[in-house]
Amino acid sequence: MMERDGGTHYIVNEKALPIVLLKTVEAKELLKKGEVVTIHEAVDRVGMSRSAYYKYKDYIFPLYEMNKGKIITMHLILKHLPGILSEVLNQIAESEASVLTINQSIPAHGIANISVALETRQMTINIEELILKMEQIKGVQKINILAQE
């Protein structure tokens, strides 16, 4: 069995996380937004122990915090419609992410596969918000994060 050094990161849907990890994120958000002043207030409000908070606080972050200043590679599946890629790129530009590379397959059966590498350092919104905005574009079928550096 291979030993883990603790440096591996995973993207996990919140539905699969234990409640203590979700409460840790919630407590951190309360502190960050200034809704509470102390850790004691934050953990009381979310209903967790201070020891659990301290145990996990340095190991759980929303995706947008982990991705700030990183290179993100996304895979998009788009319907083959005029202007759809342009709309996606406009959303990226509005977020002030920097497109490092973009690759598009030749559309087959009305579908185009796109991979885009973005540098997120200057983004004005988090990556989750950008994905939500891109998913609202007519013809965007699916968006996946493939990698982050």
Swiss-Prot record:
Residues 73-148 form the ACT domain. InterPro entries: ACT-like_dom_sf, ACT_dom, UPF0735_ACT_dom-cont. Belongs to the UPF0735 family. This is UPF0735 ACT domain-containing protein Amet_0565. It comes from Alkaliphilus metalliredigens (strain QYMF).
